[in-house]
Amino acid sequence: MRSFIKSHRKSNSLESDSDIDFKQLKRKNASTSQLSPPRYNTDYYDPVTSSPKTPTHSHTTSDSLPQKHSPGFESLHRLFNNKLFKKASNSSLNSYLANTDSQSRRSSKDQDPLAPSFHVLKTSSNPASQDSELPVIKGVITHTWGNHSKHNDPHVIVLNDPKTSFETLRSSDLEPPPRLTSKTTRSSVSSERSWSTRDHSMSPPLTSINQDIDIPEDMATRSKNTLINKKKMENRQARIHSNDDLIAMRKNSSDTLPQTAEFFASDKLPGDSTPILEIPESPPPVITLEKYNSSLSDAKELSRSKNVRSNRTSVVSMTQSEESRWSNHLMVNSNHNQNKLRDSDDSDYSNAIDEEDDDDADDDDEASQFSFEYSNLSGRTPSVKYYSKPEPKQMVYIDDLYDDEDFDEDMNYYDENEVSEFLQEEMASNKNNINTDTSVLKDLSSPSINDHSNEKPIYKPTIQMRVNKPKVHRYNDLFALSDEDDPSFNDDDEFDEDEEEGGDDNDEEDEIDEEYDQKVSDECGQSIELQSDDIHSDYGVEYYNDFGGDLNLQNDVQKHHINKEQQYISDEEFDDAITDFNMAKHIIEEEVVLDKAEALRYQKDAEPVQSKTSEDVVNYVDEDSNLRINEKLEKGDVTYQKPTLLTEVKNKQFQKKPVASFADIFNLESDSEEDINNEDGLTGLSDVGLDEDDAVSSPILQSPFESQSLAEGLVSPVICTPGKPNIINKQIIPTIKCEPSSPQEKTIENNKSHTASNFKEYGLNHPLPPPARSQALKFHDLNSELDSELPALMSNLYFIDETEEDAYNELNDVTRDEDEYLDEINTVPEDFNFSDTENDNNAAKRMLRRSNKGSFRSTYSFTDKPQGVTTESSPIKNKLEVNNKTVTFFSSPGWSKSPGSEIGMQRSKSPVKPSSGYRPFGQGSKQFPITPSHEPNYSIEEDRIASTDEILESRTPPTTYMAPSPAFIPNYSLSPIQEASSSVTNSPKR
């Protein structure tokens, strides 16, 4: 009841307001009709606003009726089912319909049109009609429909048009309002004008001030139904445009910019419900080029200042001064140059706006995307916003580094190029120290007769000595460094301290060094630069003779012939310097290598040196061998040959061959074999003409210090004698007996016969050894995470083609044990015949039915009519009972089935070896032959013979299962293999 009272009061207030508004409208219409003749229908405006309603399908009348409409008033009719105001509303509406119809017919004859595209009707000024109450439709600011353009431009819907708050809209522009009752006919108070308030932007420009436009009579008498249908078609083709679209349409449309700008002008006063169109009495002034440019720049600044995104629903408005400019510009016929300039500026501005829109669109596309989740029940579910994921970064695997870089066993990096360069530099420096001059050899071999023996040898640290300082080749070497050892910190500081503290001492030392170098260079041809004690004593052996062996030269003799008055170093350093001097002598001796045949000739004079223990004990011979070498060097029978690097020999001798087939794997050596060869110094002996039996190894390679010195990169050079066989001096270079490091070959025995292969020397052509399981890799042996789990290089893994492997096995008669077993226990054998159980005798089946009838009924099967007696609840003992176990049925091997025999197969509980010969199967049964299955050799020929006698053979070993026995004839199916005894929790009875 409260809602009824409120709505009734609201409707009364609406009626009172409509009476006041209509009286004001009558006074204004009367005054305007008396003042001016009916020329412009724009003088007449409706004081009410309306909103578009749902279109109706009734076309009974040519006019539409505005009715009292408010939310409360309409809700009352819906609430009380048209019982409250039915009589009053019908009487008032019916009385009003007759008046409005007659008035509209009279006024249609006296109308004056404004434009050919508008059909305008004047309102009659009859006092009787003016005194009658007119129902009012109240509304809010609504959207206005655009006019149909002659140039087929898209229809425009202006959002929240400010004109609608002050101007009234015609009902013809909108859809006819719905009738309040089902019996009333539709009419409209605002039918006096049908197309008067079209958009000014779409109307043609006014060419003159007081020009009357005549319209044909057929347009005046056009029926309302045609207009409504046309309006419907236009509304269906309409589109809602934003502020950006309207700006772009203004620039691209054929209409001028001032025409569309007038459409957005909203400078009407709020209290004035009837805006007055001011018509200038004098001709408008001509707009100059400067004035036009200023107005255009103002418009650009105004439009650019607006935010495009935040003002999607706003309407571009112009100031009053700008509107006056554009309205004046409508009356001006500007020259052709001004039009061109205006078009060019407009096109540039529109292009700039389009580019901004495109950039915004691109940003929106790249920012995010939307997708929808679809469910089975309710179709599309709420949308899910997801962002574009960046491309994943390329992963770096360890094997990629292995291909290009070098790592040792401890994953420490080392570069072979740096090591080889270091060795080459050391080799070049030591090569310069070696001189074939006999005087030098005599001086080194017999220091007692040396002219310069009385002088103290002084060893100065040179640049090469600094190279010998420990370099960082491994990751662990970083922790061995310190600020004292680092040359970058230590050398400069010490040099500065020495200059500050004792500059005189340094000058004296430099003078002594220069004198010593001059004397040695004059006598030997080149200066011998040795390594000082302070470098090699802390970091181990640097030269390859620093192994601490007996040098056969007494240090006391050296000390006796040296003048100690010139000593400026301590006794310990002096002793170490003498040791280094003796090592320099053996540099030349150990570089000279003679041929093997000549070595046997000199072997009579000296005792051959061999290793008698497991450790490589090196013993040196007397000094007579040194004299023999000196004699050959004096005669010129011996020429020096450049020593070769170990790295070069490694690349030639132990270069990994590419694996092209399955057989190439067995030609490769393991890493341990290569390490043994490298440690024993046997690498590259074939290049110098030596065998492994007489392997020559330098003692520098078996140094207990395990130094990575220059000697590890050198192979003893060969001294060639012209016209004589090469000579090896075993008195100087000791020999070490060692066994060949290659693994011995193993013979391959066949099932029937196989000839044992003889042992051959390493490196010769020999048949390939049998494949080892550790070397033969298959695809299923490879793990998916090899990059992080394998410690060795990826190049050691080879993907073997199984066809090549099979061909190799057939060629070498290599049997594969895995072929004799099933691949999987749950796989049915390939030779299994599924029709074996169907060919059994019918008598066995009938016996099965008779014996299992009672137990079959106990498994809750109602094939027969149940009896009222107690039955056993447990199944028969031959029933299959499993508990999550998988059972494979297959025919047992080692027995034959003759035609017409009635046999079954029993479940094997334990593997029993059947004996050869015949075995009886129960009472009255026949005897069947059993294939001997305990023989050690299981050949293929026996299988072929057995197949002719219908012997059922499987791929499993025949010693696994026992021969069948017909003890349980009802169990005629194949024998099951059960993994273990299980309970009956999951038995078939449940």
From Swiss-Prot:
Basic residues: compositionally biased ranges: 1-11
Sequence ranges of Polar residues compositional bias: 122-132, 308-321, 924-936, 972-990
Record-annotated membrane-spanning stretches: none
Low complexity bias: start-end ranges: 49-64, 180-194
UniProt keyword NADP, yes or no: no
Region (Disordered): 1-73, 97-134, 168-211, 297-366, 480-520, 856-876, 893-937, 955-990
Main location: cytoplasm
Compositionally biased intervals (Acidic residues): 345-366, 482-516
Keywords: Cytoplasm, Zinc
GO cellular component term, pick one: cytoplasm
Compositionally biased residues, Basic and acidic residues: 103-112
Cellular compartments annotated: Cytoplasm; Bud; Bud neck; Bud tip
Function, as annotated: Involved in maintenance of polarized growth and daughter-cell-specific transcription.
Similarity comment: Belongs to the ZRG8 family.
The protein's name in its UniProt record: Zinc-regulated protein 8
